[in-house]
Swiss-Prot record:
Any Pfam family matching the protein: Proton_antipo_M
TM regions (residue ranges): 5-25, 36-56, 77-97, 103-123, 126-146, 158-178, 197-217, 229-249, 264-284, 292-309, 319-339, 363-383, 396-416, 441-461
Gene behind this protein: nuoN
Protein's name according to its UniProt entry: NADH-quinone oxidoreductase subunit N
Organism of this sequence: Heliobacterium modesticaldum (strain ATCC 51547 / Ice1)
Subunit structure: NDH-1 is composed of 14 different subunits. Subunits NuoA, H, J, K, L, M, N constitute the membrane sector of the complex.
EC identifiers of the protein: 7.1.1.-
Annotated catalysed reactions: a quinone + NADH + 5 H(+)(in) = a quinol + NAD(+) + 4 H(+)(out)
Amino acid sequence: MNFSLLTTEMLTALLGIGLLAIGLLNRKKDSHRGVAYAAVFGLLGILVVTFFQYGINTNTFHQLWILDDYSVFMKEIFLVAAILVILSAIDYVDGLPRFKTEFYALLVFATLGMMVMASANDLVTLYVGMELMTITFFILVAYILGDGRSSEAGVKYLLLGGASSAVLLYGLSLLYGLTGTTVIPDLLARLTWSPALAIAVVTIIAGFGFKISAVPFHMWSPDIYEGAPTPVTGFLAAASKAAGFAVLVRLFLEGMPLQGGADWLTVIAVLAGVTMVIGNVVAIPQTNIKRMLAYSSVAQAGYLLVGLMSTDAPGVKGILFYAMLYVVANMGAFAVATAVGRAIGSDEIADYAGLSQRQPLLASVMTISLLSLAGIPPLAGFVGKLYLFSAIMDKGVLWPAFLGFVMSMVSVYYYLNVSLYMWRDDPKDDRPIPVSGPMKLTVIFSMVVTVILGIYPGPLAEVATVAAKSLF
């Protein structure tokens, strides 16, 4: 047993426990800011550690745990998302009545759950990591004490999340019953086609469909995203979705008979197509920025599912690259939503009118983030979609790429609608919106990375290629 393969997870666990201890020992009014900075520097240190884990590609604990380049890349996505959400949440947490320091500890523990999911090579390990992530989100979604919308969102997420976890666990238990093992690679060697396997695969797809907000398992996301604290919404929409795909890719490429008995690629293709269409079309009439971004995140899941359809290294490379840029752009958009919502007390798109006059930086970051999500060149989103769609086109399947292109053009409408409010209309209030140092750092980082990855994607694409090849 090689405990060194768990270095990043052990450090993350120690960081979360340390943050809780600091919060208990120091109850001063502004102590949460010090805790936030400690969390950021701790996560940055862990991120640096991951750079030295490339090339290991081995497992331990009787194959229950795997550390390969794929899992390392995914962990870096989660860590980047966690750092950005903590920086963007510092001012927001100022307005919370109680339990300020615990907020950051919960974000760290949610990140730990995602990291466990990425390295899980066993169904039980996978489920433990997923539940660690999910339970912390149950708390974070309902974190605004005395707020009816937040409490309602928390209850909805608890009930629906618990139901989806039960469905997923049923599917995993069927796999164990069919094969006698919970080690994912062994499933491929032992699985034979049967009706029970069909039920198992359907329930697993349903369970993870909830986690990634794929249609028709997406209905929870708009209400939960709207009611949850805005920084939590961003983290849930970006990092949690990436964690779901981290597992889906490993399960379906290593442990599922995608071409045996029935064509499960067809199921994935249908999910991808419907998810892209429903997510983009329903986003058009939304008047609340968080609900609009919720349906946008549904559509983004459809694009990522197109990459899964290719079942090869280029497709996985596209998923990894797009997941990273999606996290960065999405966190930038939600950081702006956090700052604006805190300043004006509203999340309505109409209230973004004249934002370019009140705070040009926030308007610029929101515009670039939304255009990147739409796939407009020369931003990173264009390159990411190019990788995803070209991977499936190389397989000779053209319709997902064509549908994805059409739906990307549809998304331009509702993304530009927000931009028009910000740049064309006059503000209802002339007072400038304050932007603190941590928030400014978050949005500038998001904007710069989104632009640079669009112009010069080579280095990240090369790392994503290496990570993808570790699965094959």
